[in-house]
């Protein structure tokens, strides 16, 4: 019996995908299926096979982005859990087993994220869960720091969807990834929605993943990435915060936009960032964007209050 479906979105990443699958073949836990959703690759990715894994490749004719590919995979999933895994990763032998054990500790746990380690330096972290602040910033916890300092399982704001397990029944209740994001911050939005509904997200250091990073986009900063991240920053705020919370956080949000504008001006992407912010405002004001806003429910009031306190506390946290 299979408990887990591992969904791997792929776009022109044949070599990366082959390496990722080789490490999945060595897992201590065998009760999983691999579903590769290919976003119209031109490099022969759909020809990749495995003689060991129970594996299926869904070949798309167009690039639906990370969110679209994942949601299509979710629609085809019949297992109680899914693992989202980037194609530019290689995993430890206990990766699946550790994530499954972690999420089964409590039915209140929606997701558990792996310890994502720098591919070139296995002593340095890439991600140990995500934090979110009143500035509207999502911060990769532990990035660039020693793995040895992040060996404790803890609750986090959200999990990086590059290597995390999710509970399917909760996904069906709160919805999958928002395809208006296309890519970037979609996992923060998903974790935020789960937190509003009263669920928890955890970091699990026993599940280890070695992450190349920016393998599909090619660089850490580029026009498309900066634009989407800026646009989605605004959309995450609009979607998940009630109006009174947006007003309460507005001084911090405006400060966050100002600081990021200066930062991207120095990188040569100031105009692109500003364009993304405008696009985020327009998306939030549109009929389509408004339809995606999380409806406020009085039963979730304590969850909103707890989240707001965390947004303030995270302003001063050393990640």
What residues fall within each predicted segment?
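Conserved donor NDP-sugar-binding/catalytic core segment of glycosyltransferases
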Residues: 89-133
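A short, conserved alpha-helix in the catalytic core of glycosyltransferases
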Residues: 157-208
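A conserved acidic beta->alpha catalytic loop
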Residues: 23, 38-47, 62
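Glycine-rich, basic loop-to-helix element that forms the pyrophosphate-binding segment
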Residues: 59-77, 87, 98
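Short, acidic, metal-binding catalytic loop of nucleotide-sugar glycosyltransferases
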Residues: 22-31
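Short aromatic/hydrophobic "clamp" motif used to bind/position activated sugar donors
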Residues: 82
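Non-catalytic, C-terminal membrane-associated alpha-helical segments of glycosyltransferases
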Residues: 246-319
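A recurrent flexible, glycine/aromatic-enriched loop bordering the glycosyltransferase active site
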Residues: 124-125, 137-139, 145-166, 183, ...
């Amino acid at each position: 019996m299979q408990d887990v479906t591992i969904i791997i979105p792929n776009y022109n990443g044949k070599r990366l995908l082959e390496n990722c699958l080789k490490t999945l073949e060595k897992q201590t836990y065998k009760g999983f299926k691999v579903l590769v959703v290919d976003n119209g690759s031109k490099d022969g990715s759909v020809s990749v096979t495995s003689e060991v894994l129970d594996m299926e490749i869904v070949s798309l004719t167009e690039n639906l982005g990370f969110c679209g590919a994942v949601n299509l995979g979710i629609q085809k999933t019949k297992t109680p859990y899914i693992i989202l895994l980037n194609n530019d990763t290689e995993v430890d032998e206990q990766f699946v087993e550790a994530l499954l054990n972690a999420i089964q500790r409590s039915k209140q746990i929606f997701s558990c994220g792996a310890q994502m380690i720098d591919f070139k330096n296995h002593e340095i972290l890439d991600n140990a869960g995500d934090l979110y602040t009143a500035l509207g910033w999502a911060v990769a916890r532990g990035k660039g720091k020693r793995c040895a300092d992040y060996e404790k399982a803890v609750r986090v704001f959200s999990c990086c969807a590059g290597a995390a397990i999710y509970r399917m029944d909760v996904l069906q209740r709160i919805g999958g990834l928002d395809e208006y994001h296309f890519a970037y911050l979609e996992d923060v939005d998903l974790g935020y929605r789960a937190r509003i509904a009263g669920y928890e997200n955890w970091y699990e250091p026993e599940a280890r993943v070695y992450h190349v990073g920016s393998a599909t986009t090619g660089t850490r900063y580029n026009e498309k990435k900066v634009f989407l991240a800026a646009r989605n920053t605004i959309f995450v705020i609009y979607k998940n915060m009630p109006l009174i919370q947006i007003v309460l956080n507005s001084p911090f949000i405006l400060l966050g936009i100002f600081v990021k504008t200066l930062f991207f001006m120095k990188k040569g992407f100031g105009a692109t960032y500003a364009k993304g912010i405008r696009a985020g405002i327009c998306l939030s004001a549109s009929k389509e964007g408004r339809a995606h806003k999380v409806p406020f429910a009085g039963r979730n009031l304590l969850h909103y209050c707890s989240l707001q306190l965390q947004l303030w506390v995270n302003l001063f946290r050393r990640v």
